[in-house]
Every structure is written in structure tokens, then in C-alpha cells.
Swiss-Prot record:
It catalyses: prephenate + S-adenosyl-L-methionine = carboxy-S-adenosyl-L-methionine + 3-phenylpyruvate + H2O. This is Carboxy-S-adenosyl-L-methionine synthase. CDD domains: AdoMet_MTases (cd02440). SUPFAM superfamilies: S-adenosyl-L-methionine-dependent methyltransferases. It comes from Cellvibrio japonicus (strain Ueda107) (Pseudomonas fluorescens subsp. cellulosa). Belongs to the class I-like SAM-binding methyltransferase superfamily. Cx-SAM synthase family. Homodimer. The lineage of its organism: Bacteria, Pseudomonadati, Pseudomonadota, Gammaproteobacteria, Cellvibrionales.
Amino acid sequence: MTHSKTDRLYANPLAQVSQFVFDENVVDVFPDMIKRSVPGYATIINMIGNLAERYTQSGSQCYDLGCSLGAATLAMRHRIQAADCKIIGVDSSAAMLQRCAQIMAADTSDIPVDLVEARIQDVPITNASVAVLNFTLQFIPLDERQSVLNNICAGLRPNGVLILSEKLAFEDETHQQLMIDLHHNFKRANGYSDLEIAQKRTSIENYLIPETLAAHRHRLRTAGFHSVDVWFQCFNFASLIAIK
């Protein structure tokens, strides 16, 4: 049920490259796509489970915001030791959630998981000890990102955490180009052609909007988190932990 097809969505020349959407075609290849496109993704997922084990409080809720097929949800579900907890997975893609529900049903953990089809911007966060935005905020319009983080921080218990993973931009143009080149080399090493890389880049242009670490730190501090720092980075992909 979790078997993933090989990502060949952009393998052939397209007369017009449409904006990327998380539809059934992406669902079918998503695990392969993200493994071959995001350096360190497996490590990030594993460590989300580790962090959830450390920070989940008894009787609280954990949120996977932009859960896609539930990789972070499963990582938390398999590691949480605190009693009477629930995980809430949220995604705006019906196709993603349908497949995610099948994956959760096949999993043997007894921690309850609720799946909600909604925009992250519209989801109330309550009684939370852990929230995850794993490569999700980058798809939310820039002018809505602060309110999303404000909402999360307000809904976290004291000492609750947000794990925020994002593709990064860099202020220094030389470093920015270096990170792009290294990332593209990573994708080539994983079997993507230059055509696939170029067409995928066109599809997410003006949709996936990366920001600098400084911008993320400032926004998290503004939201009310007292401790913010990077715990993982590979090239232009990083994950931060923010503690309330």
C-alpha cells in the first residue's frame, strides 16, 4: 500500500509546464520524488519522531500540518511515549489524504490519528505539545505565513515545540547559486535528467517561495517562540526547532 512508483512526471518535454499541484499523479510518485529531491529527508523524518518522543506531553495533541502521505505522522506515532495523546494530520489535498488514510489504517500503532482536509491557515491549534510544518510553509503565501505561526504558537502548551522544515534562500548571491548547483547535482545523482530538473523548477516557480534563515527566525520570534535554532541543514534545505 505504501509502494511508490518512480517519479517520471517531468521526464518528457512538455509544451507548457503547468503549476505544480498535489494531485493523484503526484500522490503515486510522492515518496520517490521527495526521497530523490530533498537531501536529508529520511533523517529529518526520523528525527521528527525523536523530537516528538522528547517533547510530547501527556494528554496533548500533536499536529502534522501539511501531512501529505503521513511520513512525519508515522514517525511521531511510532516514537511517542506520553499517555493519552492524539495526532492530527492536516492537508488541503484530498488525493494525499485519501492515500494517507490507507497508510494509517495499515499501521499497527494504537495512537489515534485524525486526518483533516483543510488549509493550514484555517485550522485551529489547541492543546498542542508538538506541531510539524515539514516543507509546508514554503507553499503558503508570504503575507499569510506570520499568522500561521502566530496561530501555532498560541495553541501550543508551554514548552511545546514547532518543527519547521523549509527550502532556503540565501542573501549572498554566490552562496545562493552554489546551493542551487549542489542541489541540482544531488538530483542528477539520484537519476533526474536536466530536462526533469528544469521542468520541475518551472512548475514550482512562484508557488514554492523559499526564504532566508534570518526571515524564519524573525517570524518565529515574532510569533512568541523564545528559543529558535537550526537542528539540521543540508545545502538549501533546513529544519528548525522553535520552543514556546
